């Protein structure tokens, strides 16, 4: 019989077949051609023989009907439906590639959600630290040991949080504490194909082995196909052999524990689409790592701590913040985004990252950054490693940057010798992390309580819904409006500027004196000329057009635009209704130089309308540009005038140009300064305006500056005292109307130089002023605190519906202390004499009449209940702020 196409005997390879009873047999060996349709129909597809096992004959083409049906259905679809499906696939692809929520596209599908991009955050933060250390050493000419010190400080931070470089990072042989990663097996399809091929080859080998031992081998050879369609299921070979090459690279991976001398093998198990990896990493360490704070505020704290550990006494925290904003470290926008948590975490109710997510670009005033740095310093206990800051060195640096006379510096040092100042960067006198949560405790806290724990890191906690402004735990956490605590910490930078500001008021009559004409004495210091120079140099530092600044009459508008409701208020529409929300942290702060971070050196595309361009980058690496940027502006202006002389030839005012480059360091503050120094040591002769010194307006009462020590039950326990945002706002708001234009300009300018909010600088100024003007009162308060004697403070209890009643409180320390630095908690108790004094007061009747006039329908029982319900307690400003001045200065 002539062979048909593709017909070949698979036993002997012959091409000639004979038809016998409807079946084809090979003419050479007699093997049946592999077509079992009639055999399947007649005998049911199963042939039983006596041998080693059962012989199963497979069906071919069983799914042809289904395939034909599917093809018929697909051909019946219209072209519109086919195009719609193709368009949906294409739109899904582009939607997956699009950036959402200002985040980069990362493979979230293949990364477990519980990892929180941990590897990306740690790697990005470490790379930024390494780059910062390289720039400090190679470009800013710091010592080479700064780089390893920065990395060692970060290592200590990880060890403190029990994340890495510690024994708790490993779990040993306890499998319950191991971290088990459940991941998607991306190579499942490929492994499945390889497994099918392996089983197919194994069946062939088993079939050959069965044929060699079977008694009915001839029957099998003549009636079955032993290469593909023969499937033997023997009792001896029920268990499948595992692939020895599968996951060979993971089986030999071991981890050594140096302390316990235990060897922990990493188990990698793959079951279908799921890949289960049992690691030697502790689950607790991973949980702490994903909750630890990694942002630019911690970066500032690490850099400042490393520089002070290397012995640099003249570097302030404001300098490090300014270097980051000036793009000296070339931190890219991508690195900042990698340090942040992903958008998926922000959508969950247990998001612990709103503290970092609210402001990632360091747009904070200095006191906000100081708070995080203080938390870092006190948590790691770096006091032994850090060098002590020298007030004289720092004051000389600031006076040189401001181009002030040397005699002015001597007056600043004289004032500091009379009123000592604590310039320790740990700020133990203002805040103590032992009263709340440190970095290690924040990393170990539950996600639901993380935000409230961060708010109470120094023991402060908002008490009521309205006072907290959606800043409480549990229910309020779901709203995700938490920003931060309302505590203001006075940094050493702010205290130094407060001394300079007070010396100006004590030496010059900046409030009442008129603008004096130019003095003929070339060696006399003219404060009006110096203020003009300060204003022009600040404009030059802010990148204004100097051809406009140096004109005789040309107003230079401010670049910044104030928000409608204040600097720390946000306005938004909610369902058509306007909402004004007060932020706990002053995010979006722009009263600094530069006002925002610049990414010019790391951006892929140039910014066309960016006014923050870096002029003369080579000169920016000079020591004067790094440490005295305001004084360095004379070099910048001189370079610009040399580059484009035609621009400044006929426009610039000669007097303004002369004032801009004038040197005041050798000028005399007063005409008879040398005579005063030789003949007398009187305070009034050194400070001529001290005898007629006037105090600006101050509020009568201060509130929201106390909190209980108990976090879970805020109605019991002793109190802690602090400076709140509201107290600073009230203090500056009341005094602003009495400011003179000169003092207002000096306050804003000095705060602008260090990147501080003017209200924090004025609060430090008032504290220093109280030490000078109310020294007897503060000394009495100091002795009472050290001896644990009660201090009587006048108060007002504000109740519902504007009820308020005067009362008295006695403030005493919780425990006797030997020095003010050890003072933590206070006991505030009511006095029995309070009601008697109120009864004898001349205003008691008027107050009683006014309170009851508001609610005439109140019964006696209701009035008694209202009197016992106190909403707020305001303290007398002079006494309470005096306690804060003694404790914190």
UniProtKB/Swiss-Prot annotation:
Residues 102-113 are annotated as: B-linker. Residues 229-253 are annotated as: Disordered. It comes from the Eukaryota. Pfam families: Rrn7_cyclin_C, Zn_ribbon_RRN7. Zn(2+) binds at residues 9, 12, 26, 29. GO terms for biological process: nucleolar large rRNA transcription by RNA polymerase I; RNA polymerase I preinitiation complex assembly. A zinc finger (RRN7-type) spans 1-33. Keywords: DNA-binding, Metal-binding, Nucleus, Transcription, Transcription regulation, Zinc, Zinc-finger. GO terms for cellular component: RNA polymerase I core factor complex; RNA polymerase transcription factor SL1 complex. Residues 352-510 are annotated as: C-terminal cyclin fold. Residues 230-243 have a biased composition (Acidic residues). Residues 35-101 are annotated as: B-reader. Residues 114-351 are annotated as: N-terminal cyclin fold. Its main location: nucleus. It is found in: Nucleus, Nucleolus. GO terms for molecular function: RNA polymerase I core promoter sequence-specific DNA binding; zinc ion binding. Although it shares weak sequence similarity with GTF2B/TFIIB, displays a similar subdomain organization as GTF2B/TFIIB, with a N-terminal zinc finger, a connecting region (composed of B-reader and B-linker regions), followed by 2 cyclin folds. Component of RNA polymerase I core factor complex that acts as a GTF2B/TFIIB-like factor and plays a key role in multiple steps during transcription initiation such as pre-initiation complex (PIC) assembly and postpolymerase recruitment events in polymerase I (Pol I) transcription. Binds rDNA promoters and plays a role in Pol I recruitment. Belongs to the RRN7/TAF1B family. This is TATA box-binding protein-associated factor RNA polymerase I subunit B. It comes from Caenorhabditis briggsae.
